[in-house]
Each structure stands twice: as C-alpha cells, then as structure tokens.
Amino acid sequence: MKEILEGTDVHAYTSKVITEAGQPTSRQDAKAHTFAPLFGATGYGRTQAEAAYYHHFIAKYAGIAAWHQSLAKSALNKGFISTPSGRQFAFPNITRRRNGNPSEFTRIKNYPVQSFATADIVPFTLLYIEHLLKGMQSCIVNSVHDSLVIDVHPDELEQVKYVIKRANKSLVTLINKQWDIDFNVPLLLECKIGPN
C-alpha cells in the first residue's frame, strides 16, 4: 500500500530485481512480470533471474500470498470464491494436489482481481463518468480493458478534464458505498488526449 501511495515505479523495481539477479532487463520488458504473481503466475518455467523476482514478490508481499492461501482454502472448503462485490465463482471439480494447493490455483488467484476490476470497477467508472458527462456533446465511445475512450468535443476539453479529475477524487468513496467495503486503494485515473 505504501508503494502505491508514494507512486513507486513498480516496473522499474521489477527490472532492478531481475537485472540484479543476473539478467539485464529493461523497464519495458519487466512489465510482463510485475503483476504476474498477483494473477497466479509463478517462477516455474522462467529464467533463473525471472524466477528470483517471483520469489522476491512472494516474500515482499506476504499479505498477498496469505490472501491467495485464504482463497484456496475457501475454494477447497466451499467450492467457490467471492469477489468484494459478492460475485461468486464456482469450482465444482476442484481437488487438492499433492503439494497442498488446489487444482485450479491460478484461476482461484486470478478471478477475484480480474473480475472485480473488469466486471465491477471499470463498468462502474464508465457509468459514473457517463453520468458526469450528461448534457455535454462529449461521450464515451468505447472501453478497452481498463481504459475508457471518450470522444471529446473540442469546445469541451477543459470540462472533460475536470470530469476525469472529479471522478478521480470520488471513485473510491463511491465504490465503498456501492459495495459496502473498505476499498482503501487509490484508483488513479490518467487522462491522455490525442487527435481522432
């Protein structure tokens, strides 16, 4: 959490860990590894230096590893896991492997993060920004992964920037209210402008 609040460049950090383990890696190339452990990837099948990063990630973010184990326990005991919004994912054929982990451990680690982000937060943000754009000529025309594409009328550029800034300030509070959770991770919206 501290790194998020301080704006740490996590991709540069990943690059540093892999490079110091003996494999020079650019910040751009390191991006493929930065969040992979969060979504279930391991050091298995990686180079020795890349595997060092995955092991380092688990040691540094022990809370995430503990959460993954909690998800595994829930899936094994109940046959499902839940996202913070209450969306459930069933694992009817789950089994425990010899190493103690569930048979679908990667999916178990991936679903709560990806689902909450792409099935809940992104659409929620889209609807909120659409509401803030009401009465304007500018409009949302598409969403791609975690990005919203807004067709901005030239006369409304500053207004749309203000809408994004307002959404940025309110989003966490609205998420907490919507799902009655303590969502204490800042969501920082970037605003990039280009010709169409």
Positions of PLM-derived features:
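Conserved catalytic core of nucleotide polymerization and phosphodiester-bond processing enzymes
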Residues: 1-196
